Each structure stands twice: as C-alpha cells, then as structure tokens.
Regions:
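Acidic, Mg2+-coordinating active-site environments of NTP-dependent enzymes
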Residues: 1, 88-92, 104, 113-168
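Short, basic phosphate-binding NTP loop
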Residues: 1-29, 36-53
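Short beta-strand-centered segment that lines the nucleotide-binding/catalytic pocket of NTP-utilizing
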Residues: 49-64, 99
Length: 168
C-alpha cells in the first residue's frame, strides 16, 4: 500500500473501524481558550440534562472516570475507540479540542462535526508551523474539510479572521 500521508490513512481507517459515534460532534479550535470553551460547552449541555463527553487538555470526561491524555487532540485510534464507547453508552454529544497539530496531522480526518468553534489566533506554535499563515490554515482545516453540510460555525465577528471564516 503506497500512500503519501499515512497519518491520514490511519484516521480514515479508524473512522471505518469505529463507525459508531455520538450523534453530535463539536470541535473547538484556536490559540487560546479551547479548554475553557470546551469545558463551558460541556457544563451547559450537562446542566440541560444532555449526555455529553469532552476530549482535550483535561483528559476525557463524561465517562464513569476521567481518563488522562497526553495530547490536546488524541491520536485517531484513541479518538475512534472512545467515540465508539460513548455511543454504546448512549452519550450523544462529544466535544473535542482540535489543536493545530492535531488538525495538520490529520488526527480528526474521517470525522464530520456538527459545530465548529474558533476562539482566536495569535502567534504561537511557529516552531512547528513556521508562518502565521500556515498556522491559520491548520486551524481552518476544521471548517474547510471536517464540518457536516449545514453545520454551525461559531466565532467572534470582530476578529480579523471573521471574513475568512464567513466565506468558507
């Protein structure tokens, strides 16, 4: 099997192996605030008696126990396995933090999100992305490639990136 991007293949295979997922997938991306926004969203859904789980910097919550994680955005096998578990437990809302590394490394490929949230963008991770443009493009993968048709994008209209986000 010849493939230019084995990480993308791994994500697609994971999505096919672990087909069952919660009904509503929500992703949060941005330089700062991913964890806070994911946690706020989690608490709002939980307070409204929705079954919800959250994946990110704080680990995986919403299962019987909180599982710790080493990356903000898990590897595709762990994502698939955990989403499959949540669906079996009838948890139908999952919030995932989508880091620029995770997006650029295709860890979320094969998933389709109902809601995408963009918090902000500032100069960070340029050791990995090299330019601010590359960093922004990594964040935009969520909105360009991983959203369901008719999905919801949430972002600050006053951000200088609002025009770009509106035109996706």
């Amino acid at each position: 099997l010849k493939q230019n991007n084995p990480r993308q293949i791994l994500s697609m295979l994971s999505s096919q192996i672990f087909k069952k997922k919660p009904q509503n997938l929500i992703a949060v991306t941005g330089t700062n605030g991913k964890t806070s926004i994911a946690n706020f969203y989690y608490q709002i859904l939980k307070e409204n008696k929705k079954k919800v789980a959250s994946f990110g910097t704080l680990g995986i919550s919403g299962k019987k126990k909180i599982e710790s994680t080493s990356n903000t955005t898990l590897d595709p096998i762990k994502i698939g396995r955990n989403l499959n578990y949540l669906e079996k437990k009838k948890i139908n809302n999952a919030i995932l933090e989508a880091s620029s590394h995770g997006l650029k490394q295709h860890r979320l490929d094969g998933l389709k999100f109902d809601v995408g949230i963009f918090t902000n963008l500032s100069r960070d991770h340029l050791d990995y992305h090299k330019t601010l443009k590359d960093y922004l493009n990594a964040k935009l993968i969520l909105f360009k490639k991983l959203m369901k048709k008719g999905s919801i994008a949430i972002f600050d209209e006053d951000t200088k990136y609002a025009k770009i986000l509106k035109n996706i």
